[in-house]
């Protein structure tokens, strides 16, 4: 009798130690799930999720590799390395994923930038009010405030170190077709022999009422990072670096491919929104990404701004261009 009880107890203990942790994990987000496979190379779910998310929302800070060590019961130790850098500095981010909730030990590294694009014709973006000693509010001269902000930006850039890298958010005076934009950017680069880092295009989309859906969303037309695998039939050109076709790299001026790439990323993030909540974004608008897809498919790629890694010389040259409206900058990570 005692032996039988002992066997049962041992079975329960072994189950709790070896089976239960894995069984519980099956109910929650698994960062190590295979999202794609090519030969011996596996792309994990969180590799792909973070690659798409960071390209859409984190200009100059693309991440496409995640190390996830399972602790059982839906818990994982997470490390997100930085695999490319224009400054020579590499910043990895560590954290813990507990049953679908991600806690990063340094939230600032992968947080969405506080900088923004100023949309052409949106004068409300420059609106501000002054309050006198009696509490009376007076609207400031919008155009004067805009000009003062531009002058402050130019003076800030003029004081920069010549050899340091900066991430610039560049607003355009007019919304441009992607074909015209990339042609202008490439010509500027060639004529001025400017040194650029990663280019990121801010795509303009509108909802049915004509309002911009999301000003700070876009894509990188010049691929960099790790080649990945995924469901290519469902999400064509989800990545511009394909494990199965490393010999072919899409050209930046291939507008059709770039449009497919961008809309595939929107479709993917719409279908795999776990990464949005993990990164602290709300998902309370079910039609948000579909509205963007519909607009791009109907109107093509429209660009209202771009982000780029650059040095002082290139930033000063940008301000000489008629298409450029305003530049916000921050030191490059």
Which residues make up each language-model segment?
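Short extracytoplasmic/periplasmic juxtamembrane "stem" segments immediately C-terminal to an N-terminal membrane anchor
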Residues: 30-49
């Amino acid at each position: 009798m005692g032996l039988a009880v002992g066997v049962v107890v041992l079975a329960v203990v072994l189950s709790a130690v070896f089976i239960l942790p894995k069984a519980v994990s099956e109910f929650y987000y698994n960062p190590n799930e295979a999202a794609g496979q090519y030969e011996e190379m596996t792309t994990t779910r969180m590799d792909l999720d973070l690659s798409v998310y960071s390209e859409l929302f984190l200009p100059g800070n693309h991440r496409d590799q995640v190390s996830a060590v399972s602790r059982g019961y839906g818990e994982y130790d997470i490390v997100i390395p930085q695999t490319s850098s224009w400054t020579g500095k590499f910043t990895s981010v560590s954290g813990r994923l507990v049953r679908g909730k991600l806690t990063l030990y340094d939230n600032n590294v992968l947080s969405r930038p506080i900088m923004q694009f100023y949309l052409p014709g949106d004068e409300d973006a420059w609106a501000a009010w002054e309050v006198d000693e009696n509490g009376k509010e007076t609207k400031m001269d919008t155009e004067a405030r805009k000009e003062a902000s531009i002058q402050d930006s130019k003076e800030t850039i003029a004081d920069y170190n010549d050899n340091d890298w900066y991430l610039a958010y560049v607003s355009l005076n007019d919304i441009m077709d992607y074909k015209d934009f990339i042609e202008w950017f490439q010509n500027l680069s060639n004529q001025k022999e400017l040194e650029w880092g990663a280019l990121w295009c801010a795509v303009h989309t509108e909802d049915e009422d004509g309002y911009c859906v999301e000003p700070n969303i876009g894509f990188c037309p010049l691929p960099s990072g790790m080649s990945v695998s995924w469901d290519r039939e469902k999400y064509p050109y989800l990545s511009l670096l394909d494990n199965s076709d490393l010999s072919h790299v899409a050209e930046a001026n291939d507008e059709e491919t770039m449009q497919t790439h961008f809309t595939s990323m929107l479709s993917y993030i719409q279908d795999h929104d776990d990464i949005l909540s993990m990164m602290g974004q709300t998902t309370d608008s079910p039609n948000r990404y579909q509205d963007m897809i519909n607009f791009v498919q109907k109107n093509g790629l429209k660009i209202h701004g771009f982000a780029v890694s650059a040095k002082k010389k290139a930033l000063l040259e940008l301000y000489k261009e008629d298409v450029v409206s305003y530049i916000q900058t921050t030191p490059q990570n």
